[in-house]
A protein has these predicted regions:
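Cell wall/extracellular polymer interaction/catalysis modules
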Residues: 1-124, 131-150
Length: 150
């Protein structure tokens, strides 16, 4: 077990996550994928599947879309969260395997572990940690690792 200071959703923790409630889902989840900005993050070790983020990438948060809670490419005509940002919070993203198999409409989307702001601002439902802690845990995790949120 490894504990790290983090920030969670503005609405706190919940066992009954709903789209837009600003809450972080409780549970044990695997990490599905690492997304990273290769123009900003160059040195790290990681044993899970990874993909570099480009300016056309987003994550669908529209429950009415067939792409709900999935990686998308812009242009996209439904609601989605941009992944290529000026600020650094999405320089590293571990996609938490929440509401993915199967995807349940309105149960919540885009639940990530990402980089925290300097003052550890609350998130919209994600978990955020310091960049140095993020890089450290990347070398420790595999496709069998689970994050426990409680």
């Amino acid at each position: 077990n490894y504990k790290i200071k983090c920030s969670i959703g503005k609405g706190g923790l919940t066992s009954k996550k709903k789209e837009g409630d600003l809450k972080t889902p409780k549970g044990k989840f695997k990490f599905k994928l690492l997304l990273y900005r290769k123009d900003r993050i160059r040195k790290f070790q990681c044993k899970i599947k990874k993909r570099s983020i480009n300016h056309l990438m987003g994550w669908c948060d529209d429950p009415g879309s067939k792409h709900y809670n999935k990686l998308i490419k812009y242009p996209f005509d439904k609601s989605a969260e941009k992944l290529f940002l000026k600020k650094n919070i999405y320089d590293l993203i571990l996609v938490i395997n929440y509401n993915m198999n199967p995807v349940v409409k309105k149960k919540g989307s885009a639940i990530f572990l990402h980089i925290a702001t300097k003052n550890f601002s609350k998130t919209k439902g994600c978990i955020s940690i310091k960049k140095k802690d993020f890089i450290k845990i990347l070398s420790m995790i595999s496709n069998k690792t689970k994050i426990i949120i409680h």
